[in-house]
Amino acid sequence: MESSTATHSETTSAQGSNGAGREDISSRPGAQISYEDLYRRWEQGNWKAYDLDFSQDKVGWESLTDMQRKSGLWLYSMFFYGEDAVTDGLSPYIDAAPKEEQKYFLATQQVDEARHAVFFHRFFKEVIGAGDTLAEGLAFTEPLLDWGYRGVFGRLETMCDELRADRSLPKFAQAITLYHLIIEASMAQPGQHFIEDFFIKAGNMPAFSEGMRNVARDEQRHIGFGVKVLSELLEESEECRAAVVELLREMLPYLTSVFIPPDWDEEYTRCYGFTMEEIFAWGMKSVEMKWKAIGYPMQEMPAGVYPFDPAMPHEERASRQLKLLRAGILGPPNGPAKSSPEIQEIYFDVVAKSANTEAVDKPVTVQWKFSDADPWHVVIDNGSSRAVQGEAEKADLTLKASWADWIEIAMRGESPGKMVLRRRLRPRGSLRVLRRLPEIWEPREITGVVAE
């Protein structure tokens, strides 16, 4: 194995008796992470799911409010189901890893994920009283999983199948991105942060708190591995970089929709002392740090990968994202999309920032005229793009539709060609610009352009 970046004495002193308080390796630059150090941390941080005593936690669970228990079932179900799914899915990752050091670490991670699943199974069985067996416990969680969550984990299942058939470096880069950067860094780590924070302060479920601290420490190590692998792959291969971008574009609609509580009842988060805006903002900060550590900051990614202005404060970005979700622009189908001047401003700002300005060799204006909402247009000129409310003085291309129909095309995958035939989408103007739209906006991004 390569030499470690930390000495044994440094590692031991940083870890302490149980590893709590140790530096988060997942935030280090990839070049400062070694596979040897990651493996050593696994040996030193080992813990036993069956050493936890849940007797006091059962009393603590009963002391929670009805809303806190209801919310807890929703949150912990995502963790329990996810830990089982990733345990099942790691084998093809081990086979596809190009380096022996990577295979060894992934083998330790599979053990970790199984231990996490056992921890959550014990909690569900002994504290909540749900499921005598692992299978029964997992069946209990399934109705509580949301659309975005199912989309991400459904993609993990197909990714594992793809990795069995294709062990190329670009496919491996996609697989690591999905597992370590999307599932662990973007989904699990933010949830762990807020759950752990609440129960450490409350002190009424000590075994659960200790288990969550252990899980969080393991996940930091896993994410650190993902940062290390991707920093190597993306530095060596433009093909790997393109494959990662392709996956990020594919997963954006699902990822933005995870952690939406049932029926949009925000008491599911407020009852634990945090808002949805806070968890979304914290997640954004965390993920941006990981991509910066990889050496591929989100600001350098192509248009449309993350279509919110990275210069905007995280809290404002989180608020805007949630407004699009509540309006039915992002997220699962939930009736006709809502429209308001504010929603349109947010939406078209995203559309403008998603434009590939290099796809046109002269200024282009694309206009949307809605039968039931205000008109907007996007101007692409000299390597920049901007969204403007109102009709353009001179548009190269005008797209006429109702707001609801346009969102069906843009966000739900409705065929533009079929909508044209049904006269629910009426393009007017330059055929050249119309043909160029799939180059300006990648197919099935937030603009709804589909290459047909």
Features from the language model and the residues they span:
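A generic short-segment signal for beta-strand/edge and adjacent turn/coil regions
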Residues: 43-47, 58-62, 74, 333-338, ...
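Intrinsically disordered, low-complexity segments enriched in small/polar residues
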Residues: 14-17, 356, 381, 388, ...
